[in-house]
Every structure is written in C-alpha cells, then in structure tokens.
A protein has these predicted regions:
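Short beta-strand and beta-hairpin "edge-sheet" elements
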Residues: 1-34, 119-123
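Noncatalytic modules at the cell exterior or secretory-pathway interfaces
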Residues: 21-23, 67-73, 121-142
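Solvent-exposed, flexible loop/coil segments flanking beta-strands in beta-rich domains
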Residues: 34-67
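C-terminal interaction-tip segments
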Residues: 45-47, 134-151
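Exposed aromatic-hydrophobic patches
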Residues: 54-58, 113-121
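Beta-rich globular "head" domains
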Residues: 56-89, 127-132
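Predominantly extracellular/luminal cell-surface or secreted proteins
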Residues: 87-93, 148
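Solvent-exposed serine/threonine-rich low-complexity stretches and specific carbohydrate-binding patches
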Residues: 100-110
C-alpha cells in the first residue's frame, strides 16, 4: 500500500553546522483530494542502457473504475545522457494481450532527478502496469511509481 498526495510546501527550515549534521524540517499540505490510497506499482528500480520494460501487473480486484486514476513518479537518480518515458497502462486482460490503453503519461525525463504527480478522468480497467522506456547509451535511471484510482 502507498499513500499518495499532491502537496504544497507549507514551510521548510534547516539548521546548518560545519561540525554536525544538518537538520531539515518540512511541512506539506494536501493541495487537492487530500490523501489517497494506492499501491507501489514499481518499487525502486534501476535501468541500464536502452530498453523497454514493464512493472508487475496490479489487479484492482474489481471491474473498471470510471472515476479516473492518479500516480506519482519519483526519479531518484538520472544518467548523464538519454531519456526516460514512463506511462501507466490499463487493460481488462490480465495478460495485456488486447485492449491495452494508456491511462497516464508522465513528462519525459532527461538528465535530472524529478518527481511528478499525474491524474486523469480516463476510465481505468481492472489490470494496470507501468511501462518505462529508456533511450541512449548512458540512460541509467532509478525510479519509483505509485498508482491509485478514484472511487
């Protein structure tokens, strides 16, 4: 399970010292929809070189949801060159053999760490997965994706 929140930074304070650890305190407030429940679809995964790959399939255990979906992408490390494209795919088939459609598309990632929240009113089917495509010889990325659907 994962808790997903689109947030606004309320306050940040830090204490800096040359001889001790730096302490960072931050407060965030939900900016829309409050806290939502979801699942960790793609745990911390590191890519290497050009490839197309998929997460494990998430079975929501019920039929299509017409309320839409939401997801967070966190890129914890990015390579010196290349690109990363991440989408959430949905299907009524557990094998993704037919009727595969894209529920969410994240902004293309290049050479810097980032995070992004996406949501959509598109109907999501029972089965969902993350597709990620890396292009470029030095396209090493470490990423995490969480996903949920509105009820």
């Amino acid at each position: 399970k994962a808790v997903i929140m689109k947030a606004i930074e309320a306050s940040v304070t830090s204490s800096a010292s040359v001889t001790a650890l730096t302490r960072l305190d931050a407060e965030y407030q939900p900016s829309a929809n409050g806290l939502e429940g979801g699942v960790l679809v793609l745990p911390s995964t590191t890519t290497s070189g050009a490839a197309t790959a998929y997460s494990t399939i998430v079975d929501k255990g019920n039929t299509d949801e017409t309320g839409g979906s939401y997801a967070n992408l966190h890129v914890l490390a990015a390579g010196a060159s290349g690109t990363l494209d991440v989408t959430v795919e949905t299907s009524s088939s557990a094998t993704f053999a037919s009727d595969v459609s894209t529920a969410l598309t994240f902004t293309q990632v290049t050479t810097s760490e980032t995070s992004e929240f996406k949501d959509s009113a598109v109907t999501v089917n029972r089965y969902n997965r993350v597709k990620y495509v890396t292009v470029g010889g030095s396209s090493a990325y470490t990423l995490v994706v969480t996903f949920g659907h509105y009820r």
